[in-house]
Amino acid sequence: MGAEAFYDEYIAPALTDFISRRFEGVCRDYFSLQVRSGKMKGVRNIGSYYYDDPIYRKNGEFDVALEFADGYEIYEAKYYAQPMTLDEIHREVQQVEEIKELTVKQIGFIAINGFAERKEPYLYLDGNDIFANE
């Protein structure tokens, strides 16, 4: 196996997964900084939200979950080479809406390369928002 084939087979997939996971952490750090600077108020906890529904045999993870007294803000973080599409947004929204025990106040999306389209009432952040030095 040549070097290029080895990279394509073993390194590239692991690298993509690593960068995506690290980007999720950067997004959580962004919200931590927003809270510490006073730009966001009322956040009790910042993390990921994992769910397991044995009745419907569904499980999954939401990348960024902000806990408030009256519910959660859920954000899906995507480290894509291209803008996030409206179809992807709709699939993610459907996944959030299927979780009945979770009180969701707001759904948002974070895409490093922005969005092909934006639809109300969701919140949108891109790489410029996350990495702005404000």
Set out the residue ranges of the language-model regions.
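A cross-kingdom feature that marks ATP-driven nucleic-acid transaction machinery
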Residues: 1-134
